[in-house]
Amino acid sequence: MNINVADLLNGNYILLLFVVLALGLCLGKLRLGSIQLGNSIGVLVVSLLLGQQHFSINTDALNLGFMLFIFCVGVEAGPNFFSIFFRDGKNYLMLALVMVGSALLIALGLGKLFGWDIGLTAGMLAGSMTSTPVLVGAGDTLRHSGIASTQLSSALDNLSLGYALTYLIGLVSLIVGARYLPKLQHQDLQTSAQQIARERGLDTDANRKVYLPVIRAYRVGPELVAWTDGKNLRELGIYRQTGCYIERIRRNGILANPDGDAVLQMGDEIALVGYPDAHARLDPSFRNGKEVFDRDLLDMRIVTEEIVVKNHNAVGRRLAQLKLTDHGCFLNRVIRSQIEMPIDDNVVLNKGDVLQVSGDARRVKTIADRIGFISIHSQVTDLLAFCAFFIIGLMIGMITFQFSNFSFGIGNAAGLLFAGIMLGFLRANHPTFGYIPQGALNMVKEFGLMVFMAGVGLSAGSGISNGLGAVGGQMLIAGLVVSLAPVVICFLFGAYVLRMNRALLFGAMMGARTCAPAMEIISDTARSNIPALGYAGTYAIANVLLTLAGTLIVIIWPGLG
């Protein structure tokens, strides 16, 4: 039996889609030196090659893909978006605006200089900034712009072409810039990170290991009684001196949970909870061969929970003000916008931040009730909320504004982005509403993006050879300029206008470009994870601004003549 693969793929859109996805994902795993191509560029390259062979796909799949992607981007940004926008993220907001705004203006200027259409210009902006949200926003606005169908088809093809030609240029140039730009300025990045660490009492180790607390029991002997000198536990400050706290005491056969007024007596058996290294550093008066193994004394349920910051008595406060250790709890991680932050006593908590806390189950529950709620560990998605807000986003996208003879619509991209932000924000405030497991959110976002990339590549593939010959050299120059010039402008603004610490500034710049590989290089250069503070500050707002930039470039273009 002979099977004509071309006819088979042309006759089955679903099969074609998944063949493109599978081949593209395989290609995306290849590395060029230390740079991995990535899923997006892999799927785009495969779809462009198949598009040259005149394979095509139903545009409805493309539309659904971009809608799912941009909605999930909003859901991820929602918990921290408003806190960054309205409160302590002024510098980060300004940096993101400078980065995106300068890139938009430069792209518009180069597009007019080289005589490109809006499709090539917007695609070049999206590729140079390695930003799919720009591509999504521009494509959606073009479809709702009301231009003639032949012009629309050409613009959409050129949009994909511009993105494909400049994506790798943007990615490689930014990674090279992240490696060498810190060396061209007079302040050493490692020194800047250490300065912040000294000022804020941070651990500068980017590879800090996290251990769970353990419980061990000791019998109080004369050395320990002498060491306490008759002071109660509150006066002794056991945790400050040892890194452990006393969870239980057995006295005269009676097991009790001590309060701050308890005084240790000869023969007491005490259960100490702390990290392994804290136990190893204990004064010999605690240990000295007096460790005991009492099942009841050691029978404690140590749990690790992720607590979402929500309550007003925690939002806006510094981490140190929570006094977790005073309540017998240990902080393992601080996560903001899926970025692990340095454990900094001076970090101001935002609504939606996640604290990973370990300790006795009762104590952790008490702390969680005080500052927010324990994150749900269910793997079930609230599909009702997901669908409801998706519908709201589509309805918002239908809104159109009319100014004399000129009209423009918000578009599906902006509408879905806003609806996603609201869902994410409400989820951060109401533990049982709109829950979407992070794995499910990542899967839907990634799948939507891959479907979108497959669609744009297949639709643009037939014209890539002609386009590459006509504008290839111009695209190379424009891609480099749009990729690197905004980074330099943003650095000058942050360093000499905002006067930011350089470690935080470079992290914030990579966040404004939403480029995780470049962020890793900055952290390696600083030999610290402190730049992650800046990265998290700009990342959420930049994702939103980049989507709006894709919409704005299409709206502004006709007015430039």
From Swiss-Prot:
In terms of InterPro entries, this protein maps to: AAE_transporter (IPR050144), RCK_C (IPR006037), RCK_C_sf (IPR036721), Transp_YbjL_put (IPR023017), YidE_YbjL (IPR006512)
Q: Which GO terms describe its biological process?
A: potassium ion transport
- Matches recorded under Pfam families: Asp-Al_Ex (PF06826), TrkA_C (PF02080)
Subcellular location, record wording: Cell membrane
> Which Cys residues form disulphide pairs?
none
Predominant location: membrane
Ordered alphabetically, the record's keywords are: Cell membrane, Membrane, Repeat, Transmembrane, Transmembrane helix, Transport
Keyword Manganese in record? no
Lineage, top-rank taxon, reads Bacteria
GO cellular component terms, semicolon-separated:
plasma membrane
Membrane topology term: Multi-pass membrane protein
Molecular function via GO: monoatomic cation transmembrane transporter activity
- Give TM regions: 8-28, 32-52, 66-86, 94-114, 158-178, 383-403, 406-426, 447-467, 475-495, 540-560
Ranges where the RCK C-terminal domain occurs: 200-288, 292-373
Query: What is the similarity comment for this entry?
Result: Belongs to the AAE transporter (TC 2.A.81) family. YbjL subfamily.
Protein name (Swiss-Prot/TrEMBL): Putative transport protein YbjL
Q: Which organism is it from?
A: Salmonella arizonae (strain ATCC BAA-731 / CDC346-86 / RSK2980)
Gene (name only) = ybjL
